[in-house]
């Protein structure tokens, strides 16, 4: 294609949006590499320590949108120490020095300080979008800087962050000239909200499509907000407690009927279930419903709400819905594509809420289902075989049995055959999480049949090193492998070091890996960062005559092109 001018090729590249496809076309020839270099504006980095910002900017000098991830995924389950790292400040400093025209920044599991938010807000004139997911380290003072200084802000999306609320006045820092907001999500904030400032901001934002409120926004304020913004598509309700005969409730009911654009509903952080009927008139339009934080909504009130939601494609719910409730979902929501069922009783002291019966019902009634996360207290091989037959289009299948090592509760057999049926039937499966009593046999099935698998999470599973080897040898597209409390050791770790060159990362905690094995791995694979995370009192592994047999608590290894990171805390030993 050398006879095409560069301008034509660049225009064609503009239609290639997949990061994987952009990477592939940059490898075709030097000319395409150069064109792709200067035309790529969006970059995704799955590990902030795999590259440094200076090298990124040399590679893509016209960067406008950056997505950056920090801590490993198991940080979501408190398996990564709080002070491990993942600091965004060095990235923002480098971006500011380069004077790149950054417009969008998306961060996940990173440490974000007020200083970094202040610098971000003052360094990029056309900055438009900030999305923070599961981040920590900042306060509402940092949010105030973003509000005050980002004059073209379109999206401020705060999802499940740990934020210190110094005052509830940060919303008043948006200037009166700010009319560009499309997304405003502060549901994770715990403190008070300046309702006057919020209502004024919403009223002057004609393009606002997504609004998610915290529990400090009461029902009467919600009614006023929705009256100002009937164009809202995605609504997150905060506090929802009122008498259904109250004036506030009646006003909300009248306003909601006019919100014909609503397609997504979430929140209800504090709710009076009998008030849900106010939303029934618009439920027939909903495609997404997230009640994973609505612990007070259950029973008949929940069932009635779902029965009105016939177009749902995405449902996040608590397991208090029960098997009978899932049967209602199955009979009502024929367009359902994604289901997540979260535990309402993490201590496991209550009665079994959902079982294999609910999962089978969903698989039979929702033929378009392709993604599931299902927390339950029991499962059977027969149920998993049925699910595999009913839903062969799964791309994500995550099953968490809350009691580790629990077998098929009918036959007392391992769940190998059930998960084997899933990987055999679901040819496009890319993400899989296992639980229950499992032997090496299930990993043989995974290695043989899960040809498209990119991420695998293992807990309390397997018999020997063979199990891990089956996966490493068979799953050619594996990117992330995370293992905890399983009997895999040095033999599996060291069998094929070259495999890690094509993977993004490997996490192993409470396994049989030794310090000696980790050192040998580091020697064989200098392109890897091999991190030993040790939280004992000495903050160091003991280096003595027995170190070869000393097990490591946590191993995290990942590819890098910039060598060892410089911000590791004392309890992280980088080999």
UniProtKB/Swiss-Prot annotation:
Induction: Repressed by miR393a (microRNA) in response to flg-22 (flagellin-derived peptide 22). One of its GO terms (biological process) is pollen maturation. Keywords: Auxin signaling pathway, Developmental protein, Nucleus, Plant defense, Ubl conjugation pathway. It comes from the Eukaryota. The record marks 134, 160, 375, 484 as: Interaction with auxin-responsive proteins. GO terms for cellular component: nucleus; plant-type vacuole; SCF ubiquitin ligase complex. Residues 76-77, 343-348, 400-404, 459-460 are annotated as: Interaction with auxin-responsive proteins. SMART domains: FBOX, LRR_CC. GO terms for molecular function: auxin binding; inositol hexakisphosphate binding. 1D-myo-inositol hexakisphosphate binds at residues 69, 108-109, 340, 396-398, 431, 479-480, 504. Ubiquitous, with higher levels in seedlings. It is found in: Nucleus. InterPro entries: COI1_F-box, F-box_dom, Leu-rich_rpt, Leu-rich_rpt_Cys-con_subtyp, LRR_dom_sf, Transp_inhibit. Pathway: Protein modification; protein ubiquitination. Coiled coil: none annotated. Component of SCF(ASK-cullin-F-box) E3 ubiquitin ligase complexes, which may mediate the ubiquitination and subsequent proteasomal degradation of target proteins. Confers sensitivity to the virulent bacterial pathogen P.syringae. Auxin receptor that mediates Aux/IAA proteins proteasomal degradation and auxin-regulated transcription. Involved in embryogenesis regulation by auxin. The F-box is necessary for the interaction with SKP1. Part of a SCF (SKP1-cullin-F-box) protein ligase complex. Interacts with Aux/IAA proteins (IAA7) in an auxin-dependent manner. This is Protein AUXIN SIGNALING F-BOX 2.
């Amino acid at each position: 294609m050398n006879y095409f001018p560069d301008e034509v090729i660049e225009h064609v590249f503009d239609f290639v949006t997949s990061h994987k496809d952009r990477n592939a076309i940059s490898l075709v020839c030097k000319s395409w590499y150069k064109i792709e270099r200067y035309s790529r504006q969006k970059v995704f980095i799955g590990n902030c320590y795999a590259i440094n910002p200076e090298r990124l900017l040399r590679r893509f000098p016209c960067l406008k949108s950056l997505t950056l991830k920090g801590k490993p995924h198991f940080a979501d389950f408190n398996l990564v120490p709080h002070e491990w790292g993942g600091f965004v400040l060095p990235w923002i400093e480098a971006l500011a020095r380069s004077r790149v025209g950054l417009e969008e920044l998306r961060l996940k599991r990173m440490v974000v300080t007020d200083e970094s938010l202040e610098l971000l807000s003052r360094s990029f004139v056309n900055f438009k979008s900030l999305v923070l997911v599961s981040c920590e380290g900042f306060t509402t003072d940092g949010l105030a800087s973003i509000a005050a200084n980002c004059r073209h802000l379109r999206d401020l999306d705060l999802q499940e962050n740990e934020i210190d609320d110094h005052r509830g006045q940060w919303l008043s820092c948006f200037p009166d000239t700010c009319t560009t907001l499309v997304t405003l999500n502060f549901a994770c904030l715990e403190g008070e909200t300046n309702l006057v400032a919020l209502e004024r901001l919403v009223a002057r934002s004609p393009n606002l499509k997504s609004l998610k409120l915290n529990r400090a926004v009461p029902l009467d304020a919600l009614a006023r907000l929705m009256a100002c913004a009937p164009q809202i598509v995605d609504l997150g309700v905060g506090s929802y407690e009122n008498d259904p005969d109250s004036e506030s409730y009646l006003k909300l009911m009248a306003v909601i009927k006019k919100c014909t654009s609503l397609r997504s509903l979430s929140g209800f952080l504090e709710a009076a279930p009998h008030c849900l009927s106010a939303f029934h008139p618009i439920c027939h339009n909903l495609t997404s419903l997230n009640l994973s934080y609505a612990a007070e909504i259950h029973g008949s009130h929940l069932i009635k709400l779902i029965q009105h939601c016939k177009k749902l494609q995405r449902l996040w719910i608590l397991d208090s819905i029960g098997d009978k409730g899932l049967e209602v979902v199955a009979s009502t929501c024929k367009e359902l594509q994604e289901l997540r069922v979260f535990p309402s009783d993490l201590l496991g002291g209550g009665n079994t809420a959902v079982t294999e019966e609910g999962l089978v019902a969903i698989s039979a009634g929702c033929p378009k289902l392709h993604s599931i996360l299902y927390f339950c207290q029991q499962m059977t091989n027969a149920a998993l075989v049925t699910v595999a037959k009913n839903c062969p289009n799964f791309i994500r299948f995550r099953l968490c049995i809350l009691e580790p090592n629990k077998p098929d509760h009918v036959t007392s057999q391992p769940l190998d055959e059930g998960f084997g049926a899933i990987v055999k039937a679901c040819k496009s499966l890319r993400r899989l999480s296992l639980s229950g009593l499992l032997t090496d046999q299930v990993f043989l099935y995974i290695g043989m049949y899960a040809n498209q698998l990119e991420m695998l999470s293992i807990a309390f599973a397997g018999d020997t090193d063979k199990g891990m080897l089956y996966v490493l040898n068979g799953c050619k597209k594996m990117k992330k492998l995370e293992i905890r409390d399983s009997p895999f050791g040095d033999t599996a770790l060291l069998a094929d070091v070259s495999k890690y060159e094509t993977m993004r990362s490997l996490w192993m905690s409470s396994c049989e890996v030794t310090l000696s094995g980790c050192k040998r791995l580091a020697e064989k694979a200098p392109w890897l960062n091999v991190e030993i995370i040790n939280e004992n009192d000495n903050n160091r592994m003991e280096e003595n005559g027995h170190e070869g047999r000393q097990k490591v608590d946590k191993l995290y290894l990942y590819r890098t092109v910039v060598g060892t990171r410089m911000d590791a805390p004392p309890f992280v030993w980088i080999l």
